[in-house]
Structure formats: structure tokens, C-alpha cells
């Protein structure tokens, strides 16, 4: 691994197709493991650009190679971390942690006291990783049409 850096992306960023491909690669391992399937599969280039226009996007680079991304949505009382994705070929290199730290810094910068995220009930490894990053479970919710919890909401207090 080379030199890792995190960049904040602007809506006019030229590499949205690369970000979309990264998200699809990073979320592919969930196929057949989670129900309902990840919304990442429904994300289109236009949808991603629209998301970037409303949220704060970050990209992680290993030298000049795109290896991760994350989106931060500013909400009432907290920020929401979504579409955190790390290239499968670059996993376990600290990229996810750097992206979470960038999201935390942005959340603090705008004066919000907490960062929340959701992961799936079946993805217990992800839950443990986020716990190591200081997040705690605050709720379990069900997707429409499900009578059981499908998502775990986690929160990290930053104040």
C-alpha cells in the first residue's frame, strides 16, 4: 500500500462512474447474505450524482488509485454516514477507519453532536468493526414488508 489520502469530492467531480463501480464491488459480498438486497444495486450514476449534490462525499486514494468512499448526510441533530465502501482488494488497510474519521471531523465541523449509520442485522462483522470505532447500537428496524429487524442503527457521540 502506498500513500493513503482522503479527499472531499465536489458535485462536479469527474470520477462518479468510478465511485459507482467501487460501491458495486464493495457491496457485492452481501449478495445472498442479506435480505432485502442492498440498495447499492439500485444506485445509478444519476442517482449517485444527485446524492453527491445533497450530501458530503469523500474518496480514499492509495497513491492515485481509488480505494474507498463515504457519504455524509447532515440531519436534524446528527449526521448520517452512508455508502461507506472500501475496494475489496484494499480491505484491512485502515481505509474504512480513515473514511469514518473524515465523516466524524465533518460532523464536528458543522457542530452536530453525533454520527449515525446503519448496517444489516446479518453483517455481524460490520457491527463489531463499528463498535471498535466507538459506535453503539441504538435501534433495530425493519425494511418495508418485513416483520423482523433487518437493519441495525449505530451511533457515535462526538460532543
Label every PLM stretch briefly:
Residues 1-14, 159:
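Conserved N-terminal entry element of GNAT/NAT acetyltransferase domains
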Residues 3, 49, 113-159:
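C-terminal "cap" of GNAT-fold acetyltransferases
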Residues 11, 21-48:
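Conserved GNAT-fold acetyl-CoA-binding loop/helix
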Residues 47-59, 80:
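A short helix-loop-beta-strand connector motif used in the catalytic cores of GNAT acetyltransferases and
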Residues 59, 65-73, 78-85:
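Conserved beta-strand in the GNAT
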Residues 74, 87-93, 121-122:
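Active-site acidic-Proline motif in GNAT/NAT acetyltransferases
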Amino acid at each position: 500500500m502506498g500513500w493513503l489520502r482522503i479527499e472531499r469530492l465536489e458535485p462536479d467531480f469527474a470520477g462518479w462512474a468510478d465511485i459507482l463501480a467501487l460501491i458495486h464491488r464493495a457491496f457485492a459480498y452481501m449478495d445472498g447474505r442479506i435480505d432485502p438486497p442492498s440498495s447499492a444495486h439500485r444506485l445509478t450514476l444519476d442517482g449517485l450524482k444527485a446524492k453527491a449534490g445533497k450530501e458530503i462525499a469523500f474518496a480514499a486514494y492509495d497513491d492515485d488509485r481509488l480505494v474507498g468512499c463515504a457519504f455524509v448526510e447532515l440531519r436534524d441533530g446528527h449526521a448520517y454516514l452512508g455508502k461507506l465502501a472500501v475496494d475489496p482488494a484494499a480491505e484491512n488497510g485502515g481505509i474504512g477507519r480513515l473514511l469514518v474519521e473524515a465523516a466524524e471531523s465533518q460532523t464536528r465541523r458543522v457542530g452536530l453532536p453525533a454520527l449515525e449509520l446503519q448496517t444489516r442485522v446479518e453483517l455481524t462483522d460490520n457491527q463489531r468493526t463499528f463498535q471498535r470505532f466507538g459506535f453503539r447500537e441504538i435501534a433495530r428496524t425493519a425494511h418495508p414488508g418485513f416483520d423482523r429487524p433487518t437493519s441495525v442503527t449505530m451511533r457515535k457521540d462526538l460532543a
